[in-house]
Amino acid sequence: MAKDKVVLAYSGGLDTTVIIPWLKENYDYDVIAVCIDVGQGDDWAAIKSRALKTGASACYVVDARKEYIEEYIWPALKANAVYEDEYLLGTSTARPLIGKILVEYARQEGAVAICHGATGKGNDQVRFELAIKAFAPDLKVIAAWRDDKWNMDGREAEIAYLEKRGLEVPMKKDQSYSRDENIWHLSHEGLELEKTENEPNYKHMLKNTVVPEEAPAEGEYVTIDFEKGIPVGLNGKKMDALSLLTELNKIGGRNGVGLVDICENRCVGMKSRGVYETPGGAILYFAHRMMDHLCLDRDTYHYKQQLSIKVAELIYDGKWFTTLFDSCMAFVDKTEETVTGWAKVKLCKGAIRGAGSGSKYSLYNESIASFTTGDLYDHKDAQGFITLFGLPLKVRAMMEQNVGEGQAIIESKSFKKRPTE
């Protein structure tokens, strides 16, 4: 009789490698390992071999890099979605896609369950499982680290588990940072970062970005072309999404841009400190905001600023496949219809500065904005505007004076006595 199948989100790391024999021993399932390439830069042939040697019945490697950029990163970019002012959502944007692909393989294989190796303290367990619930509410989810049958409390126990069974151990016992990498970012947690008073050891930590102080002093100029809010060209050359982001990561990395050290609020209730390398992403966000400044009117831009916070929160919390997220993105897509043009930035020792922008949809009109007098704007027009714009303040002051409290209220407003000489 054929065994039931479980689809495992397999990264090739220690946790998910241990989970393969653990699932077979504790659930008697055939394990279907699914590796999803979102730009980790891993040796997928070696990882597939490891999964099969460790006991997986099958292992599939999915190149999802293009899909990840175009369907997850670009929407977040168009929305200017930044979590808690700094985090560009590198891990958060990848998890909904991974969850969706896991469901697709579960359906294809006729699996009864999906398993992941996310810890019980992190955000990823939430993100994976919300995606699974959105597409396959009938499927069982096995979260190994929360399972009653899981009796390993750390790396040493996991290594011992594999060694006892004569299986390959995909890492050494020495300490290292806990990292998550994809085409958009690289995150670092653990070691000295677990104490907030410690400065990050950037020289030891960084992989894709130079320490800003060691970046070239002359800096570098970059021009990004946008069509409806989506990056389509770099320095005058049309490029596909993967090539463009790959090249921008190199350019940003050698100029030390996109480093973030943040103590963020996890959706599970605790704070967590991490250092993020997002060199290409930082450039794109800066350039895209330049385009929004140029092409969006005041009311739309200000409302989008508020909405961006909510979109970032939804992405961070794993609520990508929700009605609210779809509704927010419908607004974002409307705002981006005219965000077409180019933005030029200068990168220098970790800093990004604007160096010009242009668009046929630009709402900047030099003849109006110029300090010289022109036909389109009469300085005297401001008089009526100021009268009406300031009317609420004037009416309130008149009321205060009429009720006999005017002088007391005026004196309470912390006015200073100024010198008269």
Where do the PLM segments sit?
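Nucleotide-activated chemistry modules centered on ATP-dependent adenylation/adenylyltransferase
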Residues: 2-9, 14-421
